[in-house]
Amino acid sequence: MAFNPRMSILPPQPQQSRQRKKEEEAAYANMRLPDREIVGCINELGIPFTLADLQKPNPIQVQMIFEWFGELLMNKTRQTVDPAMRAAAEDVCGPELGEAMMPSDTRNLLGFYVSLRRLMLDCGVNDFSFNDLYKPTHDRLVRMLSYVINFVRFRESQTSVIDEHCNKAEQTKARIEQLYVENQNMEAQLEEMRHNRRAMEVLVQEKTVRNEELKKRLLELRRSQEKVAARLEEAKTKKGELAAELEEKTATKIALKQESAKLRPYVLQSPSALQASLAELSNTLNNDKAHIDALDRRSRALQTSTDSFSVVASDVASCIKLLEEIAIELAKEEEENVKNARQRDALTERGHNVREVERTEALLKRQLAKWVDRTAQLRTQSEEKAQKAMEKMEELRAVHRKLTEERSEKGKDIERRRVRIEQTEKKMLDLKENIENEVHAAHDEYLKMEAHIKLYITEMEQAI
């Protein structure tokens, strides 16, 4: 029993290619511009161009036209790609052999071709090749110029949108740079504030330690002041008592002197009585002297105590002055504490500002990281494109080398063929000469044979 194979719903490959080719031809028919319009557009660019130039394109003129379009649309020319291509040539062949093995015109044209190929892909030309620059034809040139001119017209119709996006990109870039500068300034201010905060914390700590020491010293001075005040009051009390006793003794002495003066006339009357009175008076006098000496000693002791009290009073005055200074210092400390509280509040507020700045910084860092990633992606893409360009250049170099080898081989083959042709011609000339000689010889032989035959026939006839 026979089975039919599964039928595919996909059209065969040649049919797909034919459909794609028909679509491309239809799109090209819509995009194709008349030759006169193309020539007019190129003349408007300032490049002299005629219908004859379009019918028979010149590679140098075509390269100039495409270079102008590259500068207009991509800001790329052979001069702009020269540094990168020179560096690539020096990297591949070395700084000494780069210029010799890869001339500047060739490498710059190759580099510009890579950028131009990207532009042509954007314009819709997918089969752009190096031959379109090196060996252009009329149909290919008309097609590429039609696509490029239509792309330029579309770009000019969308100039406002393009300018708007470019301005937005420039504004975003300027804003990023401004935010980066502000971030740097904020970081510097934050570092300065942290430094000031650490310095203020050290000063506050020193002031706190000094305040505690002054408080302890003030308490000790207050205790000493209380002790000195108690001793002063006790000394004042003793001084008052001793002064009252001294006044009492002085009054008693004066009274005794007055009584002695009154009794002196009576004592002179009787010697025995006078003797007795004298003895009594001398005893009294001795007692008074002893008492006066004692009072004198006591007065000196009181004077010493008074001097001591004056010294103590001066010490107390100095202590009071020191206490006043301490009170002033405490007032200053209170003011410093108030200032520290204000500064602490200011630091708290600045801390909030710092947190806000840190949040802003984190946001900016995220944005910066995004831009860095984007830059890295762009750099990676550019490196990949550069690698592809290097690979393409290697392929082109290999193709060039292969073409050079083929050209040299073809030259050698042509030379060999020319030599063979010359040898063949020489042989043919020799053969021609030989054949002519043989023909002449054969003709001579034929004449001889004919003469012999005629002679033979004549002899035969004569014989008959």
Curated annotation (Swiss-Prot):
GO terms for biological process: attachment of mitotic spindle microtubules to kinetochore; cell division; kinetochore organization; meiotic chromosome segregation; mitotic spindle organization. Keywords: Cell cycle, Cell division, Centromere, Chromosome, Coiled coil, Kinetochore, Mitosis, Nucleus. This is Probable kinetochore protein nuf2. One of its GO terms (cellular component) is nucleus. Residues 159-454 form a coiled coil. It is found in: Nucleus; Chromosome, Centromere, Kinetochore. GO terms for molecular function: microtubule binding; protein-containing complex binding. InterPro entries: Kinetochore_Nuf2_N (IPR005549), Nuf2_DHR10-like (IPR041112), Nuf2_N_sf (IPR038275). It comes from the Eukaryota. The keyword Metal-binding does not apply. Acts as a component of the essential kinetochore-associated NDC80 complex, which is required for chromosome segregation and spindle checkpoint activity. Transmembrane segments: none annotated. The keyword Cytoplasm does not apply. PANTHER family: KINETOCHORE PROTEIN NUF2, MEMBRALIN/KINETOCHORE PROTEIN NUF2. The lineage of its organism: Eukaryota, Fungi, Dikarya, Ascomycota, Pezizomycotina. Pfam families: Nuf2 (PF03800), Nuf2_DHR10-like (PF18595).
